[in-house]
């Protein structure tokens, strides 16, 4: 996830209309599909003052390079309920875990990730930028992540980077089904088209929209696009503090990203959000334990 304001056309009226139509057609053509609700994924929706669930942003990047197997393993082995990661794809269509559009920040490569084959990506060093301890760490594939995730009892927030057609996304849903974890993953995206593709291919896997701006009618938006909730910035909820309660009344979940300080954690808890995505998951988990009522 990023707070950069890119993909300005992602929420254009035309794209939104097409995605909404796709969701409606999905419901018409698949009447037997079992609905998925926020409570199925997040448990009881929170009240103001309740502890949110904690999701490690790109794994536990406080102790290992983001979106690498060591960072993800740290999150899986921690007390956290959720791990969050990003899914991109190589030029030959293999799903890999990577956040940025380009390789420079977190590898010794340059240029767009999408321009490289998996074999080329696997030659890159994705660890030494973080620490010499992780020199030689490779960009993992989704399949490699699912292999360490499947034996756990965790849940995964899988952010689809950019636009995925149904054809592009088919390998992702196949890998999830093969790993037997379809009941423990949630698709997220800024891109409504990708969420529409996910709904068409795997309607039983819940979906969450990531929003940089909040529409006036957030509940209507969620209903239109068949999502169980939204992920947004806490500053947007600060301006509309009643919104969290309204969404919970409507059966929708609310998560915030990416909060890394005690002040922002306290504000999110006071609002009653269901989940906090953070770069400091162990610290947040400890803070929640230390500040729980009665401690």
Task: Describe the function of each predicted region.
Residues 2-295:
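Phosphate-group recognition and catalysis centered on beta-loop-alpha active-site segments
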